[in-house]
Amino acid sequence: MAVHGLAPSQERLARDRVRAATMAAETVLHDLGVIPVTSSDAQGMGRAGETIRRTFAMAAVNKAARGPLPDDPPDADNARVLRYLAKLTINPAITHGIDGEVGSLEVGKLADVVLWHPAWFGAKPAYVLKAGLPAWAAVGDPNAAVDTAQPLVLGPQFAGSGAAPPDVSVVFVNKAAGDGDAIPTRRRRVAVRGTRSVGLASMLGGNDRTGVVRVDPAARRVTLDGDVLRADPAEHVPLTRLYHL
């Protein structure tokens, strides 16, 4: 749209893509476990730098609007947190055939870990480990007497600097490219697998519900098994300004 100077045809294209009804339905479908993966192009036209934060904000909005999940007691949200966490981690890994290397914390996989302070979960990570090594973390003023002196700024650490990144990373390729060994990279090559057989039944975290989803573009209405999906605009969205003063 910027290239064409907000031409009327481009504006109409944007309006056809960003529809309140389908965005609201997407929110409900995520909470029901019908959509198993979230991405940078979800929730409208996408927010690539805010995927994690927006995903857990969506979970909070659904909790406020729809109440606890059947597996959650009134004072806990573990089932919902695990459902939305799977949309960001193991389910995308399964979908792309790379769950043998990443997606969950298991023996034999890369120790790619994000550590959070509970008060800032979903908004500001405390540490990011890449293959078990510190790659990104909050650091204070190097001129200070203690390491907690503010301002704390997220920045690269040992695994995120110099020649270290290729040594703690992998490049995902198809089997032929992996066997051919012709890619000029220091990164370990790993072939993707199982992508042709992935289905909704392969998804984890309660994200395997099936149903008939229909989109009526004329009426701008979305139904699941005949039931219209609705979600009112949120009056409050968490993980926003309060966490980024």
Label each region the model flagged.
Residues 88:
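Residues forming the flavin
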Residues 55, 108, 132, 220:
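Conserved, mostly hydrophobic/aromatic
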